[in-house]
């Protein structure tokens, strides 16, 4: 094995000198043993500086590193465990278990740096993935193998929506999921793990964490670690869900690494390679003739500004965008999805069918009209509206409340038992509200229920 020596350490960036004839290539993994801490640290080559010196990014804490330490070239990129042995386990960026449950005992390891599938291998199927969440299935349906973005500021419910989706896919569809925590809070990661155990779906999920306190190299590469595990499940013929929370932190880690490597930043301080880095990740998240990877990516929107370069770059890769609104959350309506801002390429009569398309379009137009009437109501009151507009306001308020739904993973917060609603029941319920079948039922009956039958039952108790 070829070895070199550390010549410079600046935070998470380490320069290593090798002989000219054995210089490692970019993305090669290097290993260094830190005697004072009795631990091994993995470095990833980011640049060749010339003269046999390579600049590396540390995949862990650099405490104890010093000049002169021997570094071994592993002659391959970072490799992580793949396969069913990873299910139910919590791992770090290197695929090492961090859940105190012993070694993973994997049969195979894959490199985290892989090429996207060839164009000829891609699947063109347009199958819908029913989530059991009314507002998503009706207004912005998911496709198998699609990329979905959950956009929202801090505290509007991105992680809770993800937890519910994992629970529904595991329980109702018996599917595998890979959850990647990129730069999120350790507390959230712990809560998420415990929720998966409580929902009895832990054995269908592989969890990969690179938390906020980790060095930027970890946070930049952890998404690729999770994606590699998902690719293995896909290639075995499974329809797998890949959850990334949060794609914004992935961009941020790239910004930090870029600055550490001395690259010139672009707009708002982001790295000049933002589009390329995002493209490398997103192009690998795709479906082939063997199986599908459907990805749900939480996207933190800085200061609720959707034009920020990070969310704006993510937008271009997505098939569906779900915008979580602070105004809707303030009304106590959860999930706080904004049906007017959210959209999906799948909402097409040729894919979802004419009835579904018509109901979704009617719901949107009623809610849009209510939005326009709000100013008039605020100034002049309801009495000044025409009879037709009064009816629209009445129905839109019922629709708005019927879009709320009790989640299984949020039972402890809401006090309501979670419900999974079939697509047929969702379409039927909204269709009947639009037709005026329930104009006599007060709007309170539509809040936090599943199907329209539950509305009728709740109305009897009011």
From Swiss-Prot:
Gene Ontology cellular component terms for the protein in this record: plasma membrane; proton-transporting ATP synthase complex
Does the keyword Glycoprotein belong to this entry? no
Keyword annotations from UniProtKB, A to Z: ATP synthesis, ATP-binding, Cell inner membrane, Cell membrane, CF(1), Hydrogen ion transport, Ion transport, Membrane, Nucleotide-binding, Translocase, Transport
Query: Which transformation does this protein catalyse, written as a reaction?
Result: ATP + H2O + 4 H(+)(in) = ADP + phosphate + 5 H(+)(out)
UniProt: ATP binding residues: 152-159
Q: Where in the cell is it found?
A: Cell inner membrane
What's the Enzyme Commission number for this chain?
Answer: 7.1.2.2
One Gene Ontology MF term: ATP hydrolysis activity
The record's annotation in CDD domains points to: ATP-synt_F1_beta_C, ATP-synt_F1_beta_N, F1-ATPase_beta_CD
If you read the UniProt record, what top EC class would you report for this enzyme, in one word?
translocase
Function field: Produces ATP from ADP in the presence of a proton gradient across the membrane. The catalytic sites are hosted primarily by the beta subunits.
Q: Could you describe the subunit structure of this protein?
A: F-type ATPases have 2 components, CF(1) - the catalytic core - and CF(0) - the membrane proton channel. CF(1) has five subunits: alpha(3), beta(3), gamma(1), delta(1), epsilon(1). CF(0) has three main subunits: a(1), b(2) and c(9-12). The alpha and beta chains form an alternating ring which encloses part of the gamma chain. CF(1) is attached to CF(0) by a central stalk formed by the gamma and epsilon chains, while a peripheral stalk is formed by the delta and b chains.
The identity of this protein, by name, is: ATP synthase subunit beta
Provide the species name: Blochmanniella pennsylvanica (strain BPEN)
List the taxonomic lineage.
Answer: Bacteria, Pseudomonadati, Pseudomonadota, Gammaproteobacteria, Enterobacterales
What gene name does this entry carry? atpD
